[in-house]
Amino acid sequence: MRFSVVLNSTGIGIVLQRAAKSDGVMDLQNILIIKLRHIGDVLLSTPVLRGLRTAFPRARLTMLVNRGTEGVLANNPDVNEVLCLEKGAWDAQLKFVQMLRRRGFDGVVDLTDGDRSAVIGLATGAPVRIGFNAEHRWRGLLYSTVAKPRQADQHRVDYDLCALRALGLDTKPGTPALYPSPTDEQTVEAWMQEAGLLSAQASPLLVLLQPGARYSLKVWPHERFAQLADRLADRFVCRILLGGDQREREVAEQVARKTRCAPIVVAGKFSLLQFAALVKRCALFVGNDGGAMHIAATMGTPVVAIFGPTYPQRWGPRGGPAQVIYKGLDCRACYHPTCLRGDDSCMQQIAVDEVFTAASRMLERTPARTET
């Protein structure tokens, strides 16, 4: 019923007739890119923006994302405008869709893999609408062209780039991009100075641990993060930072209370791009699969990524040097928020020794990065 309300209220019947006559790629001038997912997902889609900007240098590129993920795109030279889809009453959602329709988009690239975004794309009235439909759902009927990935298990960066092939464009391997501003860099440097992490003689080695995640099954046990922090601090005489967003601050503080090395809790302290500027200055990032891991990899920081229910071949770090810890059990890649087996085996089987060994190898060949 909800979709039928949108269809009747925005004149989609006319769009359906017009889209059926669309045969080929236009010289696009006003493109809407849709990614209604999480921070890491939006970050991994940035190579598509680069590809579109290269192919259509004079086009206006607008990206639609969920509220809370827009910081990923701040200062990005490949996008002209970022719009946020707000959660709220249905009439407000309808007005938002009508606003999109008035924008006069001639192309939509939907990177979401979702029914809602497909309906939004159709509602814009754009004659060219590219999207994915790997599940062979009804939404495939709403696109003018369905993008087809080269292989089922390819990395999400490469998967998203297949949308450009659907536009008839050549695709090249892409790397995600973030753009901290000079102000972001200065904010981090001022904090480091105040925290005693900058010294004229020798700045300490910085290691950032990320003990939180979006759902519980992706979380390596807190006590193991605490043990890892102490062992790294003892072995490398480094300063440990505990990251996360504001919602994960309590998790970081719980880990800190279990340690001897007095780590600095930075969870919730910085904006997304300030966090990027901070992790860029760290010698190592160790954390669960999630947005922070992708930010660290994008900034070129060496990463040890701990994977459980998600598949590193699709979602692994892309950017700097990385080591993935993953057990690959028979229930692997369940993508479930809680363990269907009831024992969290995929994370419980990852020992502190294993992560410490991987982290040590990274630190032994990585110089300190406290200077920008």
Regions found by a protein language model. Give the residues of each.
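Catalytic machinery of carbohydrate-active enzymes
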Residues: R2-T372
